[in-house]
């Protein structure tokens, strides 16, 4: 019950492209980003510090780094454009900044899919921040 409440609170704050990111993760990895990656390891979810704990957590680290390189738009609440053709998703639109945000999200969704076998909910779901105190590697 507590987990459901936490997820409901997280969803209340989701606007703009974060819902698009959730959709991309569902389409590509076949998993809910909120449920699977909303609080996983040291980098999946809000914030991020320390060393990525496994390849799935590294997907979130790389995603955070990707967002850090985007300038000129809000990475969390502006909508971007993408298209689907024959199962392939392509980021587009007139705004180069939002296209970059889409490409960050798309790369993360593909990374999650490619690392489903490394996902370890028993070990890294709701991972305590006190275990993420090692020095972070550079992006």
Curated annotation (Swiss-Prot):
Write out the catalytic residues in the record. Answer: 63, 105
Q: Cofactor note from UniProt?
A: Binds 1 Ca(2+) ion.
Give Gene Ontology CC terms: extracellular region; host extracellular space
Q: In which tissues is it expressed?
A: Expressed by the venom gland.
What is the catalytic activity of this protein? a 1,2-diacyl-sn-glycero-3-phosphocholine + H2O = a 1-acyl-sn-glycero-3-phosphocholine + a fatty acid + H(+)
Residues that hold Ca(2+) according to the record: 43, 45, 47, 64
Primary localization class, coarse: secreted
Q: Could you say which residues form the signal peptide?
A: 1-16
Biological process GO annotation list? arachidonate secretion; lipid catabolic process; negative regulation of T cell proliferation; phospholipid metabolic process
Q: What does this protein do?
A: Snake venom phospholipase A2 (PLA2) that inhibits the ADP- and collagen-induced human platelet aggregation. Exhibits high hydrolytic activities and preferred the anionic micelles to the zwitterionic micelles. PLA2 catalyzes the calcium-dependent hydrolysis of the 2-acyl groups in 3-sn-phosphoglycerides.
Q: What is the protein's given name? A: Acidic phospholipase A2 DE-I
Q: Please name the source species.
A: Ovophis okinavensis (Ryukyu Island pit viper)
